[in-house]
A protein has these predicted regions:
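Eukaryotic N-terminal, low-complexity and coiled-coil-prone scaffolding/targeting segments
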Residues: 1-25
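Conserved aromatic-histidine-acidic binding/catalytic patches
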Residues: 12-15, 53-59, 177-181, 227
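Papain-like cysteine protease catalytic cores
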Residues: 18-22, 26-49, 70-207
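Structured, charged interaction cores in eukaryotic nuclear gene-expression proteins
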Residues: 47-68, 75
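Beta-strand cores of modular interaction/reader domains in eukaryotic scaffold and signaling proteins
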Residues: 51-56, 62, 202-204, 228-230, ...
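Conserved beta-strand elements of beta-rich interaction domains across eukaryotes
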Residues: 59-60, 68, 208-210, 234-236
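A short acidic (Asp/Glu
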Residues: 63-67, 73-74, 213-216, 240
Length: 241
């Protein structure tokens, strides 16, 4: 088991944290031609999307994909950048008021704000990509997004408690499944982050379910999506129209 984990770790670390944008057709080559279910679903995805940007499969892919995709969109939307920056600036105080220790979250928040300030200078895409490929910067962004998700879940614990299995409190769930690095994300994490930052996320779900079409969910329901992600069991990548 330890050897298997090590092999998976080696495979993961050989993949870029965030890749270049690629033609969506690269997905067809990832599955056997006779894998009818996936080939049909990729064809269906092609009706709506043209490109994909992959993320490293390390358990942090949802946060990294969300972070990069939204910040990339902010390079061309100064109004949303100002709104988002104001929410992000205030978020540290919100977390401290909830009981998070200021000195433990400060560095993560500072890195997050630094990156938003970089976006304000309208750098080239390569500069933003460079930040997300720098493991220390990229991981600090992931940690802060995890903290924001945890904070929102705990603030709205009355609502989210119903979705948590195993008799755990929302706080226990956050300490075990949200805040630690490499913990995979599910609907509950996506709902919380989308609402915490007021950024709509659309996820296309590509799995082995019957039928040749890909189902999607928008978080929160009925909102206008800004971030488009592809989910394959255990992993998220970024989609482009």
């Amino acid at each position: 088991m330890a050897q298997q984990d090590r092999i998976q770790q080696e495979i993961a670390t050989s993949i870029l944290l965030v890749s270049d944008r690629q033609e969506l057709s690269v997905l067809q080559r990832e599955y056997a031609a006779e894998d009818t279910i996936y080939q049909l679903k990729i064809k269906d995805l092609h009706k709506k999307y043209s490109y994909i940007r992959k993320t490293r499969p390390d358990g942090n892919c949802f946060y990294r994909a969300f972070g990069f995709s939204h910040l990339e969109s902010l390079l061309e939307d100064s109004k949303e950048l100002q709104r988002f920056k104001a929410v992000a600036a205030k978020s540290k105080l919100d977390l401290v008021n909830q009981g998070f220790t200021e000195f433990t979250i400060e560095d993560f928040h500072n890195t997050f704000m630094d990156l938003l300030e970089l976006c304000e200078k309208q750098p080239g895409l390569s500069e933003l990509l460079g930040s997300f490929r720098d493991q220390s910067v990229s991981d600090y962004i992931v940690v802060y997004l995890r903290l924001l998700t945890s904070g929102y879940l705990q603030r709205e614990h009355g609502f989210f408690q119903h979705f948590i299995e195993g008799g755990r409190s929302v706080r226990e769930f956050c300490q075990q499944e949200v805040e630690p690095m490499s913990k995979e994300s599910d609907h509950i994490h996506i709902i919380a982050l989308a609402q915490a930052l007021n950024v709509s996320i659309l996820v296309e779900y590509m799995d082995r379910g019957e039928g040749g079409t890909v189902n999607h969910h928008v978080f929160p329901e009925g909102s206008e999506p800004r971030v488009f992600l592809l989910y394959r069991p255990g992993h998220y990548d970024i989609l482009y129209k």
